Amino acid sequence: MDGRAAGADGVEIPGRYRHAVVPHIMVEDAAAAIDFYRRAFGAREDFRIDAPGGGVLHAEIAVGRSVLMLGDVSVDEAEAGSFAAPAALGGGTSVTLHVFVPDVDSLAERAEAAGAEVLQPPTDMFHGDRTVILKDPSGHLWVFLTHLEDVPEEELRRRLAAAG
């Protein structure tokens, strides 16, 4: 199947993507973002196409076992006209990227040292995960989690109610 994998639903997925849903984020400076993701999150750059006039047209990085696509908004906006980086949206974003990691505490330290803003320090949560919420220098929100325990639905609801 030439590098392709069939998902559970029979859809062919190019082998490098591993999942049917592949987030694609827009940033003001993709080269700097890739460097930050490498230093902060241990990401690996797998693919990159630079635009003829400068900037990154398209890049793919591996974060854990998942792929994230990204590119410079200034390069892509001429084509689609509707892409925007968080800064163009007043600093907000409607998407958070959740990533499970073996040690959320060490990741939080490394990410903060690399320039991430810690919005919520590592905290044991009612849903059974230790979680940190970070904002990267491009304005995207990341939630990193270390799974601590499986929590049955009834217990999850009880804990949520008790938390107020």
Predicted regions span which residues?
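Hydrophobic ligand-binding cavity/cleft-lining segments
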Residues: 28-31
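C-terminal catalytic core of tyrosine-transesterase DNA break-rejoin enzymes
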Residues: 138
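Vicinal oxygen chelate
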Residues: 2-24, 34-35, 41-135, 145-164
